[in-house]
């Protein structure tokens, strides 16, 4: 059972159909890691293969061994981010002392969400832009990413018997912090 968007073995295949070995996967990851750095200096629509390859100290031809275009690389990067952070955003909420110090718990959650958004701003900006433009692939990734926090807040609201709809309450809080 899939828990959300993630890269399947087919997504990791090189352009010639091979599944990369350890060195190939390291090169692929280096290209993914270079993308947010470049996005700090250019808009998503201006992001290009040459700039990513240069930042990764490799060639555009190497980029094309792993990704057909910039959009595919961004989908992979955003998918990886959502997989890694889905559970972490949930833990950010559930691993708090809401009984004896709810104000401090809320403060830590807000700070944690804002820190996450700041640290991953380039990729999250792309998720927001492409989602608003109607790209369902990016919207699905963004929704899955935020679902960890939303579900945890919904559970917390239901558990504490907060008046109103727990889903609405959770959605408002996540919307304000996202």
Task: Give each language-model segment a name.
Residues 23-35, 52, 77-89, 149:
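Generic hydrophobic, amphipathic alpha-helix propensity
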Residues 94-99, 119, 124, 131-136, ...:
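Hydrophobic alpha-helical bundle segments that form small-molecule/ligand-binding pockets
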Residues 34-38, 116, 176:
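Short amphipathic alpha-helical elements of helix-turn-helix/winged-helix folds
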Residues 30, 34, 38-72, 76:
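Helix-turn-helix
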Residues 1-26, 161:
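N-terminal intrinsically disordered/low-complexity leader segments
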Residues 72, 76, 90-119, 166, ...:
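Hydrophobic alpha-helical connector segments
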Residues 39, 67, 73-81, 127, ...:
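Alpha-helical DNA-contacting segments of helix-turn-helix folds
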């Amino acid at each position: 059972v899939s828990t959300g968007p993630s890269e399947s073995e087919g997504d990791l295949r090189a352009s010639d159909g091979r599944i990369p070995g350890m060195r190939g996967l390291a090169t692929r990851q280096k290209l993914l890691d270079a993308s947010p750095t470049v996005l700090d200096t250019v808009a998503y629509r201006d992001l290009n293969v040459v700039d990513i390859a240069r930042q990764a100290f490799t060639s555009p031809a190497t980029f094309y061994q792993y990704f057909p275009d910039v959009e595919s690389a961004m989908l992979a990067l955003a998918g990886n981010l959502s997989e890694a952070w889905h559970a972490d955003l949930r833990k950010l909420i559930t691993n708090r002392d809401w009984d004896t110090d709810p104000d401090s718990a809320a403060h830590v959650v807000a700070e944690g969400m804002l820190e996450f958004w700041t640290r991953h701003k380039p990729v999250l900006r792309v998720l927001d832009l492409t989602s608003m433009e109607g790209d369902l692939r990016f919207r699905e990734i963004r929704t899955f990413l935020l679902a960890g926090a939303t579900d945890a807040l919904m559970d917390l609201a239901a558990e504490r018997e907060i008046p109103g709809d727990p889903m609405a309450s959770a959605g408002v809080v996540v919307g304000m912090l996202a």
